[in-house]
Amino acid sequence: MKEYFIDDQNAYMRYQDFPGESSPILFIHGLGCAGSFDYGEVVSQECLKNHRCILIDLLGAGYSDKPEDFDYRVSSHAAYLKSFVESLELTNLTIFGHSLGGPIAIELVKLCLDRVEHLILSEPNLDASVSGSSSFEIAAFSEKEFVDYGFRKVLTESQTSGNTMWAATLSNWSPYAVHRLSVNAVQGGEVSWRKLLYDLKIPKTVIFGRKSLPDDDYESLDRDGIPLKVIENVGHSMAWENPVEVAQVTSDIIKNNLSQRLESIFRSLFLW
């Protein structure tokens, strides 16, 4: 585990940095999760072992610091991650964002576009959260209510319903971080995250689990020409359910993007 000091928050973000000679991949987890919890088994697969893989715990989550005066909005997470990416001098970067980590990934790409080769999202939030989503239910509490008793209520309900993995990692979040990020999810982005995704002029791919389908986002993304991948026999928590296949699909996407870029370069040289 390593740590990165965020000056304007006087706080440390902690992360794991697995070495590799191939292009780097930065993994951004979703609400209630942590890179240190979600992606260790993914990046240990043979198909990714040559890539430099960086697993972060966002501020407020996992092993990172949990400042109470931070607003925990998507754009605020993206801002310190931009500085983090620059501090590591990352280039030719693939950014992988899951669920509510998807909007953070999208906004981060926009902030450091010249450093990013590909954006991969797994079942991302693209529009404001609606009833039925965890973030919507959490945001229905006032912040005081959630800190006083709502956080414990969500943890208990997750445990008793059998969602024990999420309960385990959620328990290491700051209640303030959970609530403020959830409220932002319900508000949506100043510019919708869907529009930001569509406007990005880089290769991008969105992954869904077969058990999550049918899904309105899948249909709309397919209709709008966004490349999609489906992993069989998994749902939303795909990195826990089948880390081997998540790794393989990620590797295949990166390889395919590289081959397309090389083909484009060779074609331009030939035409010249």
Description of each model-found segment:
Residues Q9-Y63:
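Conserved HGGG/HGGXW glycine-rich cap/lid loop of the alpha/beta-hydrolase fold
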Residues G32, F37-Y39, S64-F70, V130-S133, ...:
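Conserved catalytic-core motifs of eukaryotic protein kinase domains, centered on the activation segment
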Residues I54-F96, Q248:
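Active-site loop/oxyanion-hole signature of alpha/beta-hydrolase fold enzymes
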Residues G97, G101, A105:
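Gly/Ala-rich beta-loop-alpha elbow adjacent to hydrolase catalytic centers
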Residues I106-L111, V116-V147:
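Flexible "cap/lid" loop of the alpha/beta hydrolase fold
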Residues V130, S134, K144-D199:
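Conserved alpha/beta-hydrolase catalytic His-Asp/Glu region
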Residues Y176-V230, A239:
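Conserved serine/cysteine hydrolase catalytic core
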Residues V234-A247:
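Catalytic histidine-centered segment of alpha/beta-hydrolase-like enzymes
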